[in-house]
């Protein structure tokens, strides 16, 4: 991904989990989420994710993700990209957030923030919830981090989140587009032209936000992402970091909506 972005002179935003890689424990979703196995089969998960990811935290011991390679993270920032939080224990947050106490939620965020500070020597300015999973406890705990913005949800446009009747001060910039792995798992002709499916999801004049997972877009799907970037630019779209979008939104004087956050599928 870094090579692609450098060749296209793109500055992007990277959200990194800083705790253990326990991806293999996501196997419980086979029993808890109807259709999960079918989606993984259509996605071709072993080939796209690799056995290291699929077995990590089960048959293969967990290793830290961001914290294990501070040199890589510093090189990402040195190339002009933004680096933000993507939780601490990604699988625990994504699968068990609703069971965590307010203290446990705050601790997950605090551990990620401390790891970030240990690498970059400064406080994080942005966060994206693992699996777009959030709730009232998480949003309230996140308020204490002093973030510039967060990207915790799927939606249509930037907004101020409302919790228990209170408008929070951390701007939300939602992901507006489908991800590549979602497109791969869809039925129908989109699978034969995923870059065109992405192109069709762009809304002219809007803040389009695309999330790409490094293990997919930086691997077997890299040619698809490369082609999508070319097609989008040919149609006049520019690509920037989310922190630049947040600064533009906050500096525009636009009256942003205040919205509650609900569970989607």
Model features per residue range: what roles?
Residues 178, 215-218:
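Short Gly/Pro-enriched loop/turn and capping motifs at secondary-structure junctions
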Residues 1-126, 131-171, 190-210, 217-265:
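Catalytic alpha-helical scaffold of carbohydrate-active enzymes acting on polysaccharides/glycoconjugates
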Residues 157, 172-189:
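Positively charged, amphipathic and often flexible ligand-engagement surfaces
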């Amino acid at each position: 991904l870094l090579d692609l972005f450098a060749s296209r002179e793109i500055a992007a935003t990277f959200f990194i989990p800083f705790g253990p890689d326990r991806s293999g424990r996501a196997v419980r979703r086979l029993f808890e989420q109807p259709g999960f196995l079918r989606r993984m089969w259509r996605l071709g998960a072993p080939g796209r994710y690799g056995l290291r990811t699929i077995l990590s935290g089960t048959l293969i011991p967990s290793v830290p993700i961001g914290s294990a390679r501070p040199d890589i993270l510093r090189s990402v920032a040195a190339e002009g990209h933004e680096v933000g939080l993507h939780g601490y224990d990604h699988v625990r947050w994504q699968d068990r957030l609703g069971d965590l106490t307010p203290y446990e939620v705050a601790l997950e965020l605090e551990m990620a923030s401390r790891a970030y500070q240990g690498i970059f020597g400064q406080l994080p300015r942005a966060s994206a919830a693992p699996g777009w999973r959030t709730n009232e406890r998480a949003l309230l705990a996140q308020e204490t981090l002093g973030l510039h913005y967060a990207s915790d949800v799927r939606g249509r446009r930037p907004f101020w989140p409302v919790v228990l009747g209170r408008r929070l001060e951390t701007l939300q910039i939602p992901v507006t587009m489908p991800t590549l792995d979602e497109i791969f798992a869809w039925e129908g002709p989109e699978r034969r032209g995923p870059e065109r499916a992405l192109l069709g999801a762009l809304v002219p004049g809007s803040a389009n936000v695309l999330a790409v997972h490094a293990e997919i877009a930086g691997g077997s799907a890299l040619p698809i992402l490369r082609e999508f970037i070319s097609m989008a630019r040919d149609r006049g779209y520019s690509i920037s970091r989310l922190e630049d979008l947040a600064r533009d939104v906050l500096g525009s004087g636009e009256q942003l909506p205040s919205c509650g956050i609900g569970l989607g599928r």
